[in-house]
Amino acid sequence: MSPDLNCISSSLLRSEPCINSLIAILTVCGQQLFSSYTFSCPCQVGKNFYYGSAFLVVPALILLIAGYALRGQMWTVASEYCCCSCTPPYRRSSPLERRLACLMFFDITGRALVAPLTWLTVTLLTGTYYECAASEFASVDQYPMFANVTPSKREEMLAGFPCYTSAPSDVIPIRDEVALLHRYQSQMLGWILVVLATIALLLSKCLARCCSPLTSLQHHYWTNHLHNERVLFEKAAEEHSQLLIRHRIKKVFGFVPGSEDIKHIRIPSCQDWREISVPNLLCVGDTSQGPYSFLGDRVVEENEEDRQEGIEMKP
């Protein structure tokens, strides 16, 4: 891929409107496939409401949780700016850092709400789930044919409306009117949700920027700084960890995997195996340097090979 295409794709992936649009499109496609292959109203009294409501709300909750869980920034906020009483003193953040964390959390929430709001909007505008959930609660007192029907029989007939493929001629107009009413109500709720979500998004953006300690240019710089810091840190951490692990492995075994000229190997002692079997935590407390590794810090002396038994590798 050419550098120009790489630059364009990178800028698109970092563009919030493009990512939000992509999430919304994928959610719409997933909702249509989900409805086509999995949803079938039970058309039974007492089950329609729970079944339709579950298909309407539960996927939205799952998408919301996934939206939070899949954002790396969410775990950064949780680990770096945690204000719990159990947080060690050296990890407690300042008021300014907490305000920046709140600003970051607003951004994360805005992105996480795209998929569930899209799901709810599309399902309400389609009306299938709502029609199933509300079928047994329809008001049909104005129709003469229901005047002499017992309440239990009426509930059974109403619950079966979403599944009627063939019905008596006097029931078909009533069923169509009830279905039309439910779709109208569902679509009205969908448009109300769109309006409320738009207003809430605008207000949250304004509130976040108003309460932010950063100006517009500072916020832009800070966002780019966090992104570049994360990218460079991951590259440096990967290279550093590989070099450190190779150094530790050489101290334990006397050679590094991939070496062409191996003349000496070291046999780890029982104490070495006991120590490298216990995981060590990174920089806990006020220690100046953490062990970083399962391999520990025991085998660090320059003359370790002279004191431990080894095997010379003949060429």
Curated annotation (Swiss-Prot):
Q: Which organism is it from?
A: Mus musculus (Mouse)
Q: What's one Pfam family the UniProt record gives for this protein? A: Ca_hom_mod
Checking InterPro entries in the record gives:
CALHM
The record's subcellular location field reads:
Cell membrane
Question: Could you say which protein family the record assigns here?
Answer: Belongs to the CALHM family.
State the encoding gene. Answer: Calhm4
Q: Which residues lie toward the Extracellular compartment?
A: 38-48, 131-184
The SS bond pairs are: 41-132, 43-163
Q: Which residues lie on this side of the membrane: Cytoplasmic?
A: 1-14, 72-104, 209-315
Any idea what this protein is called? Calcium homeostasis modulator protein 4
What cellular component GO annotations does this protein have? plasma membrane
Q: What exactly does this protein do?
A: May assemble to form gap junction channel-like structures involved in intercellular communication. Channel gating and ion conductance are likely regulated by membrane lipids rather than by membrane depolarization or extracellular calcium levels.
The membrane-topology field of this record reads: Multi-pass membrane protein
Self-association state and partner proteins as the record states: Oligomerizes to form decameric and undecameric channels. Two hemichannels can assemble in a tail-to-tail manner to form a gap junction.
An example GO BP is: monoatomic ion transmembrane transport
Q: What start and end residues bound the annotated signal peptide?
A: none
